[in-house]
Amino acid sequence: MNFIHHIALLLLSTCGICTATETEQPAAAEAPLTMDAAIEKVQFITEKKPTPNAKYYMFFYTASWCSPCRAVMPKIIDEYAKMMADEYMEVIIISFDDTVEEALAYLQKCNSPFAAVMNNSAEPGKMPGCLTDVCSVPHIVVVDSTGKFIYRGHALRYSEWKKRTTPPPSAS
């Protein structure tokens, strides 16, 4: 399965459009892509790229014009700082802004440390496969390193995604 199909299926599943039975099965000789391998092929709009080998990947669908998005961004930045201390989670922004310039200005204004892509696949530098007419903002999708869905929902349900991705207490 090529990269565009992988990301498209990930995002279609995210939006509830398809199920595992509707997806194309990889050829026997083709190994499934890990999230690291899939993300490595994405053309980001930011200089920042995701740190490889995270346990979880959070895709945060957001936009500069969305006040709930702006309200939750500081909480996500805070949690990211805590979780990245152990390389536990990587956050990738999927911007619903109209232009790359608007997206970058928003990320700079919030001091976002995240890698970012645009939601539309029509132009270079944008994330392939997102269905903008189905997805809404703010929205979060959390997957593990194999691409298995952990959480999907509204970003303001902060406690839900945090609960599902918080590392267990270390044994002393």
Which sequence ranges carry the predicted segments?
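A short beta-strand-turn-helix
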Residues: 34-57
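Thiol/disulfide oxidoreductase modules built on the thioredoxin-like
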Residues: 121-164
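Thioredoxin-like thiol-disulfide oxidoreductase module
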Residues: 98-136
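N-terminal targeting signals for export/organelle localization
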Residues: 1-40, 172
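Conserved redox-active cysteine motifs that mediate thiol-disulfide chemistry
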Residues: 61-75
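Structural recognition of the beta-strand scaffold that forms the well-ordered cores
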Residues: 59-60, 90-94, 116-117
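Conserved helix-turn-beta segment immediately C-terminal to the redox Cys motif
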Residues: 55, 73-93, 108
